[in-house]
UniProtKB/Swiss-Prot annotation:
Record location of the Glycyl lysine isopeptide (Lys-Gly) (interchain with G-Cter in SUMO2) cross-link: 468, 484
Gene Ontology process terms (BP): cilium assembly; cilium organization; positive regulation of protein acetylation; visual perception
Region (Disordered): 605-660
Gene name per UniProt: FAM161A
Tissue distribution of the protein: Isoform 1 and isoform 3 are widely expressed with highest levels in retina and testis, with isoform 1 being the most abundant in all tissues tested.
Assembly description: Interacts (via central region) with CFAP418 (via N-terminus); the interaction is direct. Interacts (via C-terminus) with microtubules. Interacts with LCA5. Interacts with CEP290. Interacts with SDCCAG8. Interacts with FAM161B. Interacts with POC1B. Interacts with CEP78. Forms a microtubule-associated complex with POC5, CETN2 and POC1B. Interacts with CCDC15.
Segments for region (Required for interaction with CFAP418): 341-525
Protein name in UniProt: Protein FAM161A
Coiled coil: 93-120, 296-320, 522-552
Amino acid sequence: MATSHRVAKLVASSLQTPVNPITGARVAQYEREDPLKALAAAEAILEDEEEEKVAQPAGASADLNTSFSGVDEHAPISYEDFVNFPDIHHSNEEYFKKVEELKAAHIETMAKLEKMYQDKLHLKEVQPVVIREDSLSDSSRSVSEKNSYHPVSLMTSFSEPDLGQSSSLYVSSSEEELPNLEKEYPRKNRMMTYAKELINNMWTDFCVEDYIRCKDTGFHAAEKRRKKRKEWVPTITVPEPFQMMIREQKKKEESMKSKSDIEMVHKALKKQEEDPEYKKKFRANPVPASVFLPLYHDLVKQKEERRRSLKEKSKEALLASQKPFKFIAREEQKRAAREKQLRDFLKYKKKTNRFKARPIPRSTYGSTTNDKLKEEELYRNLRTQLRAQEHLQNSSPLPCRSACGCRNPRCPEQAVKLKCKHKVRCPTPDFEDLPERYQKHLSEHKSPKLLTVCKPFDLHASPHASIKREKILADIEADEENLKETRWPYLSPRRKSPVRCAGVNPVPCNCNPPVPTVSSRGREQAVRKSEKERMREYQRELEEREEKLKKRPLLFERVAQKNARMAAEKHYSNTLKALGISDEFVSKKGQSGKVLEYFNNQETKSVTEDKESFNEEEKIEERENGEENYFIDTNSQDSYKEKDEANEESEEEKSVEESH
C-alpha cells in the first residue's frame, strides 16, 4: 500500500498542465510545443550538462536534487519536454524491471549510508542509535523522493491499474496528436533508446557527500544554471478544425443545394434508367389458334343450363319442405266435416215424410174453458178474503203480564224487587196498527245494502298527478286551518275552537269498564256464527264461479259455435224459402218453430252467461283489491239485523194469535 500510494502521489504531482513561462497561464493542447522538438532541446541541454560535468563534476552531483536537466526548479517543466509517451508506454515489463533495479540500488546506497554513519560514530566513540525499520523506510522514501525526477516517474504511472483515470485523461488529450507524430518522425527507436539510457544512468556517479555539502555551493550552482537557461521561443500554432465542424459544414452545404439541382440529378438518373428500356425492341408472338375457336359461346350455354338446373332443383326442394299452417289444415277439415253433415242431413230429410199438422179441434175455440178458469179464480179470491176476516175476528190481544204466575220468592226483599220490576210503565199497544207501524219503522231505519262500484283502471301514469294534486290541496287546507292571519285582528288559528257542551261530564279515567251481560255474549256469539256462515257461503260461491269458468268454453270456441249455429239457421231458412214455406208458418204449425226458439233461447242464455261471468270477474277483482273485510262486516250486520227483525215479527204474530 505504501509503494502504491507513493507512486500515485508522484503521478498526481507530475500530472500538471504545462504553463507558459512568460504569461504564467496554462497552455492548451494545440498551444503546446512539439514533444519531439522538446526532446531535441533536452538532448542539447544534456550535452551541455555533460560538458559542464566534465569541468565541474562536484557541482553537478550536488545539485542533482534540484535540477537534473539544467532547468530552473521554479519553472514548471512538462513531461513532453523530455519523454515521448508512445515510445515508452508499450514496454511495461521493462519498466517494472528497471524500477526493481532502482529499488535494489537504493537499498544498497542506504545500507552504505548506515555503515558510514556507524563508522563515524565508532570513530567518535559514541554508541549507535537504534534505527527502526519504519524510520529507515521513511528516510529511504525521502531520499528516493529527492532523487526521483517527476517526468521520469510519469512513465510508471500510466501502466499502473490504480491510476486508470489519470492515464485516460492524458490519452484522450493526446490521442489525436500521437499518430500524426509517429508518421512525421521516424526517429522513434533512437529516442526510445535514449530514454532507456537516461533511466539506466540515473544512479551513475551518485555520491552521498554531495548531499552533505553546504547550501552555498548549491546556491551558486543554481545561479550559474539560471544564467545558462535558454529563452522561451514562441511557436505559431496553426488551428485545425474539428472533425465534427467539418461534418456539420458538409451537411450545411448539402442542405444549401437548391431544389433545381436535386431535380436535375433525379432527371439524369431517370434518363440513365430509361435509356436501356427505350433501346429495347418489342416483338409480338403470333396469335394462337385456340383464340379463334368459339369457346365463349359454349361456356355461356353451359352456364345457362347449369343455372336452370340449379333453379329447378332448389324449387323442388322448397316445395318439398313447404308445409301449410296448422290452422289452415284444421279449417279445411272442419269445412269438409260441415259439408258432410249437411249432405247427410239433406239425405235424411229427403227420405223422411213431410210433416202434416192435424186440424185444430173446435172445442178449443169455445168459451167454456175460459169461463171455468175465471170462476175458479173468483172462488179462490173469495175464500182468501173470508179466511182473513175470520182470523181477524178470532185474534185477541196479548194477556197481561200480571196475570202470569211468577215464582214464589224465597226472601221478602226479592219479592219487593220483583214487584217493582213487573210494573207496567206504558199502556197496551194497538195490535191492529202494529204491523204497519213496524214496517214503516224498519223501512226508515233499515240500513241500505252497499252496492259494489266499479273503480277506474289504475294506470301507472295517472296516479302521480292525482296524488300530487291531493297533496297540494291537503297542504292548502292545513295552512288555512293552522297558520296565523297576516292581517288584523291577527287571530292565531283560523279554525274555530270546538265549543264544549256544558252538559257533557268528563268520564273519569279510573272507572272500570262495563261488565258484559249474558245477552251481549249471546249477541256476540250469534254475530260470530253469522260471520262464519257468510264466509262459508262466500267461499262456496267463489268455488262455484271458478268451476263455471273452468267448464265454460273459450271465447274463440263460443264464437265458432255461434257462427256454426248461424250458418245452420241460414241454410235452413234458405231451404225453406226455396221450398216456398215461410218462417211464420213453420213457427206456428211445426216443431221447427220450437227448434228455432230453442236456438234463440240458447243464444240469449250464452249472452247472459257471458255478461254474468264478466260481472263476476269484475266483482272478484274488486274483492281482491281489499273490499272483502268490509263486505263481510256489512253482510254480517245485515244478517244479524234480518234475524232480529224475523224474531220480532214472529213474536208479534204469536202475540196477535194469542190475543185473538
